[in-house]
A protein has these predicted regions:
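Domain-level recognition of nuclease-like catalytic cores that cleave nucleotide substrates
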Residues: 95-116
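An acidic- and aromatic-residue-enriched active-site/binding cleft used to recognize and process polar
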Residues: 62-66, 89, 110
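Short, surface-exposed linear segments at secondary-structure transitions and domain or protein termini
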Residues: 65-71, 112-116
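N-terminal "leader" segments that precede or initiate the main folded domain
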Residues: 1-7
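Catalytic cores of nucleic-acid endonucleases
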Residues: 70-99
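Conserved small/polar residues in nucleotide/adenosyl-binding loops
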Residues: 118-122
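N-terminal ordered "arm"
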Residues: 7-66, 73-74, 79
């Protein structure tokens, strides 16, 4: 599922209007960033407006937001540059190493994409 979320994010396969963080901040995606195939955040140099303010930084994607803790990102300064955490299940709030909260956006798999993936995987 996490790889599917990467695909959905990279190709903007989600409604581009009325996106909001889990805390109600309005989200406008300007640029999803460059996919990272190495260690570190999943996408570099994304451009996102949160409540009209432009943020440029990295994006991390997990199936569940609690994976942030499981992967140790809360203690890894490499992830302090994350400006938006993408998840399909926001089961916890996530924070930088200094305790500052990171905005989270819930993305779900559009039906037509999920059906296609189910057929592909078999």
């Amino acid at each position: 599922m996490e790889q599917l979320l990467h695909y959905i994010w990279k190709h903007k396969i989600f409604p581009l209007q009325e996106l909001k963080t889990t805390t109600g901040q309005k989200v406008e995606i300007i640029d999803t960033g460059l996919a990272n195939t190495n260690a570190g955040p999943d996408f570099f140099n994304a451009k996102v407006k949160l409540n009209g303010i432009l943020w440029i930084g990295n994006v991390e994607i997990h199936e569940r937001s609690s994976d942030w803790l499981k992967h140790g990102h809360h203690t890894d300064a490499t992830y302090d540059s994350v400006i938006l955490h993408i998840t399909s299940d926001a089961d916890i709030d996530v924070h930088r190493t200094n305790g500052e909260p990171i905005p989270q956006l819930i993305l779900t798999c559009p039906d037509y994409v999920c059906r296609s993936e189910e057929r592909r995987v078999g």
